[in-house]
Amino acid sequence: MDRIIEKLDRGWWIVSHEQKLWLPAGELPHGDAEQFDLVGQPALKIGEWQGDAVWLIQQNRRQDMGSVRQVMDLDAGLFQLAGRGVQLAEFYRSHKFCGYCGHAMHPSKTEWALLCSHCRERYYPQIAPCIIVAIRRDDSILLAQHVRHRNGIHTVLAGFVEVGETLEQTVAREVMEESGIKVKNLRYVTSQPWPFPMSLMTAFMADYDSGDIVIDPKELLEANWYRYDDLPLLPPPGTVARRLIEDTVAMCRADYEV
């Protein structure tokens, strides 16, 4: 899986360090290795896109290192591969030594894992499961402005799964903790790998059951019910949050625009 890049190699280049991505001219590099001065670098093939290899190179470039968020407008499959590269690079960087015996680790030749040749321990990338849920009440959807997003964007509620919790229990707990309401009729919609830093978003839709909105001020600046045709600033297209909102709007239109 790991080899030295040669002059004739070409493809998509995920050059990553400390959760950053090399984006010359603001774009994901695509082309010949020589064009980007990558010949001789150790690389890992992490997939293919449109017939070309996708290579991961763990390297810090002096300029043009940016966030993977800057390539969110790429096709979903390529964005997913870019996210995979950033997450794998961070995994390899943060697991250089075995947590049990302290000896150096080396990558597996057959899977995304690191191995300890001293105590035989095996490590895999840690993925944090999260829930994200759109809640509908009649012709309205619950949207909130998060403390960490002070740019006016309103979105649906989300949170991390705790140890020993089912996804359904997480939805009920997170919604109650952040907004003070109860939900019913929970339906799974989709999932999305989310490399910020190493999450897997599991998306749901639900209906309002009971309770008044009482926000957790440590998490939210405000939350309210918004009619489907009068919405505030929303998350960008390509995010699972935006899909949930648009799906809820579509259902409201079907019910209220006869």
Swiss-Prot record:
Keywords: Hydrolase, Magnesium, Manganese, Metal-binding, NAD, Zinc. Divalent metal cations. Mg(2+) or Mn(2+). Binds 1 zinc ion per subunit. A divalent metal cation 3 binds at residues 174, 178, 219. GO terms for molecular function: magnesium ion binding; manganese ion binding; NAD+ diphosphatase activity; NADH pyrophosphatase activity; RNA NAD-cap (NMN-forming) hydrolase activity; zinc ion binding. A divalent metal cation 1 binds at residues 158, 178, 219. Homodimer. Belongs to the Nudix hydrolase family. NudC subfamily. This is NAD-capped RNA hydrolase NudC. The gene is nudC.
